[in-house]
């Protein structure tokens, strides 16, 4: 009997990707990352709405009780969505791991999806997310770059804007599709891995249904193009380069190089980054300012410089250090030069004064 139970626990564990790193501190974090972000959405914004349903009423606990209990234990819950994941996160005192594993399991397995919650709580919260996002023109430029570079898949809009009607039944169906054993990664910080696996197997997470693995493996199709959005406030000119896995190291170094004192371009650039996914990535950089004419001059300087063969090898050690601090090590030892070729372009703000892509 014991042998059968052990075998069942081992089989259950194999369904999940579970990893944890222990530490000497008193605080722990636990993240359940579900491959159910916007790239997998069958309706625009549905992943965002499902994320906002997390930590509402479940079959055995009200949302108020769930929040109150966690606060009494000194913990908190968060739910977020991006292009790849819906992430349920808990922060808590280390000794309370069993409670928070069970709580996350209840949310994944037993969320009630009550009809009144959609108009009264979920939709207002989603509108708030949009209002916060739209205060920063860089977020607008990033959405445009993704849409131009990928169109579908990673190009799908993350936030729900009400363009396409999404019903409660749609959200329930999407939850059934993505909240399955094959689509979940569980990551703990300040957590003993053996304990985490044991508690997961004993929780409702272990009772989640099986389903189709959604994690994208095939490389998405890349495009290049231009998008422009007239909007009040600061202006942004941005470029993006779709990146294959083999190019991750080069563009990690480039992003760190361009935002450090090693590059003469760094004063002109607001931000630069590489977003990495299992099968592709997107490098993007953003020039931002209140004066659109200055933004136009600066983006032209940046692109003109990057079209030359730029030696970025001086940033390898700095990049390696930063990535190690982010727990995202990549071998950058072979990185030398980079030269900008095809790219996507987005202009936001006073677009009458911002250049077109063919002027860069």
Curated annotation (Swiss-Prot):
Record has Transport as a keyword: yes
Chief subcellular location: mitochondrion
Keyword Hydrolase attributed: no
Gene3D superfamilies: Metalloenzyme, LuxS/M16 peptidase-like
One GO CC term on file: mitochondrial inner membrane
Keywords tagged on the record: Electron transport, Membrane, Mitochondrion, Mitochondrion inner membrane, Respiratory chain, Transit peptide, Transport
GO MF annotation, one: metal ion binding
Range annotated as the organelle transit peptide: 1-15
Membrane topology: Peripheral membrane protein
Cell location: Mitochondrion inner membrane
UniProt subunit comment: Component of the ubiquinol-cytochrome c oxidoreductase (cytochrome b-c1 complex, complex III, CIII), a multisubunit enzyme composed of 3 respiratory subunits cytochrome b, cytochrome c1 and Rieske protein, 2 core protein subunits, and additional low-molecular weight protein subunits. The complex exists as an obligatory dimer and forms supercomplexes (SCs) in the inner mitochondrial membrane with cytochrome c oxidase (complex IV, CIV).
Similarity field: Belongs to the peptidase M16 family. UQCRC2/QCR2 subfamily.
The protein's role, per its UniProt record: Component of the ubiquinol-cytochrome c oxidoreductase, a multisubunit transmembrane complex that is part of the mitochondrial electron transport chain which drives oxidative phosphorylation.
Name listed for the protein in its UniProt record: Cytochrome b-c1 complex subunit 2, mitochondrial
Organism this protein belongs to: Kluyveromyces lactis (strain ATCC 8585 / CBS 2359 / DSM 70799 / NBRC 1267 / NRRL Y-1140 / WM37) (Yeast)
Lineage: Eukaryota, Fungi, Dikarya, Ascomycota, Saccharomycotina
């Amino acid at each position: 009997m014991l042998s059968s139970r052990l075998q069942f626990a081992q089989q259950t564990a194999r369904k999940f990707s579970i990893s944890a790193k222990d530490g000497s501190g008193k605080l722990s974090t636990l993240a359940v990352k579900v491959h159910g972000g916007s790239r997998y959405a069958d309706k625009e914004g549905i992943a965002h709405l499902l994320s906002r349903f997390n930590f509402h009423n479940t079959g055995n606990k009200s949302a108020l009780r769930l929040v109150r209990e966690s606060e009494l234990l000194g913990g908190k819950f968060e739910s977020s969505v991006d292009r790849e994941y819906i992430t349920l996160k808990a922060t808590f005192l280390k000794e309370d791991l069993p409670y928070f594993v069970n709580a996350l399991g209840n949310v994944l397995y037993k969320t009630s999806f009550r009809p009144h919650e959609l108009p009264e709580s979920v939709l207002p919260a989603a509108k708030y997310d949009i209002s916060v996002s739209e205060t920063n023109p860089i977020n607008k430029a990033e959405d445009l770059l993704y849409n131009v570079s990928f169109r579908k898949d990673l190009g799908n809009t993350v936030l729900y804007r009400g363009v396409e009607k999404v019903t409660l039944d749609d959200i329930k169906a999407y939850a059934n599709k993505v909240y399955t054993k094959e689509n979940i990664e569980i990551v703990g910080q300040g957590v003993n891995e053996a304990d985490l696996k044991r508690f997961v197997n004993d929780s409702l997470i272990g009772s989640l249904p099986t389903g189709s693995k959604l994690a994208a493996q095939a490389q998405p199709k890349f495009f290049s193009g231009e998008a422009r959005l007239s909007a009040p406030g600061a202006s942004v000119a941005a470029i993006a380069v779709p990146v294959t896995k083999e190019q991750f190291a080069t563009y990690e170094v480039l992003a760190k190089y361009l935002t450090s004192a090693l590059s003469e371009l760094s004063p002109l650039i607001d931000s630069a980054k590489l977003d990495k996914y299992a099968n592709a990535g997107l490098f993007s950089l953003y020039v931002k300012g209140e004066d659109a004419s200055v933004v136009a001059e600066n983006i032209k300087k940046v692109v003109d410089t990057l079209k030359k063969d730029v030696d970025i090898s001086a940033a390898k050690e700095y990049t390696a250090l930063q990535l190690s601090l982010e727990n995202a090590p990549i071998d950058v030892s072979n990185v030398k030069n980079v030269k900008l070729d095809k790219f996507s372009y987005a202009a936001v703000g006073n677009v009458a004064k911002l250049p077109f892509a063919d002027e860069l």
